[in-house]
């Protein structure tokens, strides 16, 4: 993907006299015919960032400052060993029309090694309620992708709102294709 999509786009912008410096997010779908680019954005993708940043060792502000000042190549960016997986909870009807205002129940204590991220939520009379199609996501970290997935799903199982649904196959393809990966390698999986 980097060689066939990202680098040609960045090099093309430089050739046109508009070199790119910053965050370039590519929405990509892998199809039987190959790579299909859905969109480019000059921002972090959400929830894609939620599966990557938990593995960053160090200060994100330092990385962004180095990028902004043209010194990113000189900055060593270190990643934690392990894996992260993110699962997205959606409202019924998403991505088409969906109801809003359903009360959301969250756990009193979050499971270890999980992070909860709000997206389509609102606070109505001191109650957290649904306010969008992608309501929230849960990221789990672990030594292996399998462990990270188990933690993400354990966190998601502790959340409830009417009509809530989420995919149960996140990372399954990665588990099969990475079955020979060594523990300690960095892996991530996310699909909404």
Across the structure, where does each feature detected by a protein language model lie?
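Short, well-ordered alpha-helical segments
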Residues: 140-157
């Amino acid at each position: 993907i980097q060689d066939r999509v990202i680098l040609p786009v960045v090099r093309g912008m430089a050739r046109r006299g508009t070199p790119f410096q910053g965050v370039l997010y590519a929405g990509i779908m892998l199809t039987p015919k190959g790579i299909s680019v859905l969109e480019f954005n000059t921002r972090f993708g959400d929830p894609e960032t939620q599966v990557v940043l938990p593995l960053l060792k160090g200060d994100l502000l330092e990385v962004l400052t180095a990028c902004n000042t043209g010194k990113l190549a000189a900055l060593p960016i270190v990643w934690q060993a392990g894996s992260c997986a993110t699962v997205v909870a959606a409202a019924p009807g998403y991505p088409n029309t969906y109801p809003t205002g359903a009360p959301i129940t969250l756990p009193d204590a979050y499971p270890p090694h999980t992070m909860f991220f709000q997206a389509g939520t609102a606070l109505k009379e001191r109650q957290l309620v649904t306010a969008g199609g992608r309501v929230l996501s849960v990221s789990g970290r672990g030594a292996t992708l399998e462990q990270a997935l188990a933690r993400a799903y354990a966190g998601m199982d502790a959340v409830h709102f009417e009509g809530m649904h989420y995919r149960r196959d996140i990372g399954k393809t990665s588990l099969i294709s990475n079955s020979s990966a060594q523990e300690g390698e960095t892996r991530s999986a996310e699909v909404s």
